Amino acid sequence: MEALSQIEGRAIPYGAKNVDTDVIVPAHWLKTITREGLGRGAFETLREVPDNIFDSEEFAGAPILIAGDNFGCGSSREHAAWALLDLGIRAVIAPSFSDIFSSNAFKNGIVTVVLSQYEVDRLMEVAQSDPIAVDLETQTVVTPFQDRFPFEIDPFRKHCLLNGLDEVGLTLTRDAAIADYESRQKTQTPWLTTGTERAA
């Protein structure tokens, strides 16, 4: 997982409330188990409308998405996070998120930023023409107009995102401790490993 410190650039001022995971990525995209190419399915039904914001050249490659209350509600499909990531989104800002979506986003290296409705509205306004930045180190969202909006994030999640640690990467940071434990287990409880070693 790529380490994150600051995410800066244009933000897609979407703003819709109660956006469920079926809107983020329709069910027929769930047949795939690969993450590559899922960005084509992100907001597919909305992109069928001409001049939609997700296909606008102005917001091409935008790393930030601004949404409304309860973003990511509905089914728990992890493909929703995969699709956003493949679209290039590294941070989503909203007044609230579905807990399951927020967890899936974190596990895939997407920062979910909770701000007040007033702050989200202000960022929606700025995003129409100017970039914004999400600073994970200082836990603030800033604009070119001196707006500084602090946000909360779980310390463990912050550590993992800053260091690019997914579940596998986090386990590997404890590799020496795991090896030490396994060595002690072989000595203290040899009957647990003898049969396995013979089979190997």
Swiss-Prot record:
Name of the top EC class for this enzyme: lyase
Keyword Amino-acid biosynthesis: yes
UniProt entry keywords in alphabetical sequence: Amino-acid biosynthesis, Branched-chain amino acid biosynthesis, Leucine biosynthesis, Lyase
Molecular function terms, GO-annotated: 3-isopropylmalate dehydratase activity
CDD domains xrefs: IPMI_Swivel (cd01577)
UniProt pathway: Amino-acid biosynthesis; L-leucine biosynthesis; L-leucine from 3-methyl-2-oxobutanoate: step 2/4
InterPro entries: 3-IsopropMal_deHydase_ssu, Aconitase/3IPM_dehydase_swvl, AconitaseA/IPMdHydase_ssu_swvl, IPMI_Swivel, LeuD
Pfam families listed in its UniProt record: Aconitase_C
Reaction(s) this enzyme catalyzes, per UniProt: (2R,3S)-3-isopropylmalate = (2S)-2-isopropylmalate
GO CC annotation: 3-isopropylmalate dehydratase complex
One GO term of the biological process aspect: L-leucine biosynthetic process
EC number assigned by the record: 4.2.1.33
Family, similarity comment: Belongs to the LeuD family. LeuD type 1 subfamily.
Main function: Catalyzes the isomerization between 2-isopropylmalate and 3-isopropylmalate, via the formation of 2-isopropylmaleate.
Quaternary organization: Heterodimer of LeuC and LeuD.
Record-given protein name: 3-isopropylmalate dehydratase small subunit
Organism of this sequence: Erythrobacter litoralis (strain HTCC2594)
Lineage of producing organism: Bacteria, Pseudomonadati, Pseudomonadota, Alphaproteobacteria, Sphingomonadales
Gene name linked to the record: leuD
